[in-house]
Regions:
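Extracellular/periplasmic, surface-exposed regions of secreted and cell-surface proteins
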Residues: 1-23, 34-343
């Protein structure tokens, strides 16, 4: 179709990692011990193995419409898209110590957990999946190349907030610019090549967490206990971390205003921006209790503000060209709060 362009992109990254570890019997000199030698640890050789597979899949589907109207005075670009991201990991670990009198040899061909004493076997595993889905739209418009507008909207969903009812969140941005040097009243200023005033406001989110299921209560092994007559050993379990069924997206609101200019036949470029960013529902760790690993909560609000400036000079002298640049950034950080009801 005329004025339309469709783009589909797909990528996949698969990684497989496996390894083996051998722990020999370690002996150290000790002149106070019999034979002047002390054996460290259990005094048994040990082997361990692990295998880990990780998959990452990204897909993007973008439909773009581009057109100009009224002899090129009105220029429009509109994009609609759908993106997905999937990440999964699976890991299995195992270890065994030697049997009585059966030393595991220091030979990589024999470093397998099946060679050790089955009574000393230990194992563990890790498995998780994460998915992000986004629907987005963007519009870019300019009138005669001097009045510039853009706007975007996206709806993001993340499996990090599964079971909370807060999987989906909307975000948007608006921006505008004025290329003043395209105005008739600026044409007589010969040393000023370009001057643009710009401003924008937008929101975005963060769902990056160091665990896959922060809202779900996961159990891990703990100390065993003995009960009853005859005595029976019961395995113990504890919460791996404090689950949070109310967890939601971290949200960032940001706005900035500034200008860009080129002078002296475009040799000198300068730009300055004042910005302010406020992060709400900050994802942070909740202090652990009773020995548990800290959980994750939306605990605070942080505000950043400052100025960004950059300047560059570029020139040509005969066949020799050179450029010089410098930049300056200031930031004022303020923690507005680090508290939430219930903590």
């Amino acid at each position: 179709l005329k004025h339309f362009n469709f783009k589909a992109m797909f990528s996949m990254d698969y990684a497989s990692n496996n390894g083996r570890t051998y722990l020999p019997v370690m002996e150290v000199y000790d002149d106070t011990a019999a034979g002047d030698v002390v054996t460290l640890g259990t005094g048994k050789t040990e082997v361990s193995q692990f295998k880990e597979n990780e998959t990452k899949v990204q897909s993007d589907y973008l439909l773009t419409y581009t057109n100009s109207f009224d002899h090129g005075n009105h220029n429009l670009t509109a994009t609609a898209g759908f993106t997905t991201y999937y990440n999964s990991l699976s890991r299995l670990d195992g270890a065994r110590k030697q049997g009585v009198g059966l030393v595991i040899p220091d030979d990589p061909d024999k470093w397998f957990v099946s060679i050790g004493d089955a009574a000393t076997a230990t194992n563990g595993s890790t498995q998780w999946e994460r998915t992000t889905v986004s629907m987005l739209a963007r519009v870019i418009y300019n009138y005669k190349g001097k009045y510039l507008f853009n706007g975007s909207f996206r709806r993001d969903g993340s499996s990090a907030f599964s079971y909370t009812g807060n999987e989906w969140q909307n975000f948007f941005s608006l921006g505008g610019g004025w290329l003043m040097t395209e105005e008739e009243f600026m044409k007589d200023i010969k040393w000023l090549d370009m001057l643009k005033i710009k401003a924008s406001y937008g929101t975005l989110g963060n769902q990056n967490l160091d665990r896959a299921y922060p809202a779900e209560p996961l159990l891990s092994n703990a100390y065993s206990a003995v009960f009853g007559k005859p005595s029976i050993i019961y395995p113990g379990y504890q919460l791996s971390y404090l689950p949070n069924p109310n967890l939601r997206w971290e949200k960032v609101e940001a706005w900035e205003a500034g200008f860009e200019t080129n002078v002296l036949r475009n040799r000198l470029h300068f730009e300055g921006v004042y910005y302010k960013k406020r992060t709400k529902d900050l994802l942070a760790e909740v202090p652990g209790i009773s020995g548990t690993v800290p959980g994750i909560g939306n605990l605070g609000e942080i505000e950043n503000m400052g100025v960004e400036m950059a300047a560059s000079w570029r020139d040509q002298i005969g066949d020799w060209g050179y450029s010089v640049s410098a930049n300056l950034t200031t930031i004022k950080n303020k923690v507005k709060s680090l508290v939430q009801d219930g903590y």
